Amino acid sequence: MKNLVSVIIPVYNASKTIEKTIKSVLCQSYTYFEIIIIDDWSTDNSFKIIEELSKSDSRIIIYRNQKNLGVAKTRNVGINIAKGEFISFLDSDDIWKCSKLEKQLEYIKQKNADICYTSYEMINNNETNSVLRVAPKEINYNGLLKENVICCSTAVAKTSLLKKYPFQTEFFHEDFVMWLKLLKHEYKAVGIQESLVIYRKGGRSSDKLKACRNRWIVYRKSEKLSLILSIYYLINYTLNGVKKYYFC
């Protein structure tokens, strides 16, 4: 449907945060959206919270996996369900600012872009120690190989592209791999430097050695880069990580 935004929220054991996350979508100044919430077989009361919230707004569509599939497959379920011209992803513990969708859709049209991401504020589970991550105005394939500047909860992309290039479930950094595929095909990705998302760091990416190993696998097996290029991009990734987490 033209101009409709399909907001995809995968949920797994997010009872402490999911209500606030959903309400941050419902507060949007741009109101022509559907919220597709897929519960990935949560063992807490996340699904009950989602069911209750869905009664208050017909734009909320809920779905429950019959077993735990993981975030990549769960997002792909949402992509298959989506009816909108655009898809926007939101993790179940992150929060949007109320002007996010409106500003991104305007910017996509202004720049004739396929993907739009934004700056974001990174907080811990106690919602303290906010750190601003400023998005570059534009990113291409080679730039993304050095550093993944597209935080998934900030992104809006054309649905047609995501249905063609969904998340690849064999890689741990599934969102990074998907953005790489899109940019490799020269789709245009632009960034809004205003912070429009609050990203909860939590325990994600806490194992830096594992993250480096997974990034190496992406370079070699997904992107099939040479040994020299893989080393070059891994060094850039590591240096950017040190700068991001220890000097900001």
How would you describe each model-predicted region?
Residues 16-19, 44-53, 95, 99:
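Acidic helix N-cap motif at the loop->helix transition within catalytic regions
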Residues 39-48, 67, 91:
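A conserved acidic beta->alpha catalytic loop
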Residues 80, 136-211, 218:
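Conserved nucleotide-sugar donor-binding catalytic segment
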Residues 13-27:
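Short, well-formed alpha-helical segments that are part of the catalytic scaffolds
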Residues 65-82, 103:
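Glycine-rich, basic loop-to-helix element that forms the pyrophosphate-binding segment
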Residues 99-130:
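Conserved donor NDP-sugar-binding/catalytic core segment of glycosyltransferases
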